[in-house]
């Protein structure tokens, strides 16, 4: 695969001159220091490159609860980065919090439907509010598709993948919303 220009890269390799000119990582950030440095590189006219030929060794969290805590904390700090740098953040950083809001709205609507509360509503309103389930259903279908397409994984790995992926997205999104609300 060919190298390509990117907006940010984790585990980046930088020339010494980058730090001499732009300074080091922003130590006031507990997460996202790499993204912030990549932003300064781009704003100074530099380029960030992604090369699939480069490899790093990464040790993931040993337990599922620790993974959830990690992604929650990362979401909290991403909200701080959004607060500091606003529109310079990619739209993809808003997908996990929108997922959390969408799933929450879907759950509220489901409870209202199951308790019969929506029966008193006009038919057009019931139909309209039922549309709130579409994004959650699409997300669930995407997870099922990702698990299904994991050709090199056995059944156990696929089951974990089906649990871990939404756990990462939801915990990150919930952390982001908390970080946005509490500053």
Give residue ranges: language-model regions:
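A recurrent flexible, glycine/aromatic-enriched loop bordering the glycosyltransferase active site
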Residues: 1-17, 21, 30, 36, ...
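Membrane-interface anchor segments at the N-terminal boundary of transmembrane helices
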Residues: 87-98
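Generic alpha-helical secondary structure signal
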Residues: 9, 14, 66, 70-73, ...
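Membrane-embedded multi-pass helical conduit in multi-pass membrane proteins
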Residues: 99-182
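Catalytic donor/gating beta->alpha subdomain of glycosyltransferases that bind UDP-sugars
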Residues: 26-89
């Amino acid at each position: 695969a060919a190298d390509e220009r990117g907006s940010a890269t984790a585990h980046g390799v930088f020339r010494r001159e980058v730090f001499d000119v732009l300074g080091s990582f922003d130590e006031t950030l507990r997460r996202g220091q790499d993204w912030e440095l990549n932003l300064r590189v781009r704003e100074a006219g530099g380029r960030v490159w992604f090369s699939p030929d480069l490899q790093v060794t990464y040790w993931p969290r040993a337990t599922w609860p620790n993974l959830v805590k990690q992604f929650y904390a990362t979401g909290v700090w991403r909200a701080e980065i959004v607060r500091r740098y606003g529109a310079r953040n990619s739209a993809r950083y808003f997908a996990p919090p929108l997922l959390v809001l969408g799933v929450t709205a879907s759950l509220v609507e489901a409870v209202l439907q199951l308790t019969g509360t929506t029966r008193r509503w006009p038919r057009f309103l019931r139909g309209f509010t039922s549309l709130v389930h579409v994004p959650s259903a699409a997300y669930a279908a995407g997870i099922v598709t990702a698990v299904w397409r994991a050709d090199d994984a056995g059944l156990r790995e696929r089951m974990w993948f089906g649990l871990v992926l939404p756990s990462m997205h939801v915990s990150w999104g919930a952390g982001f919303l908390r970080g946005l609300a509490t500053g």
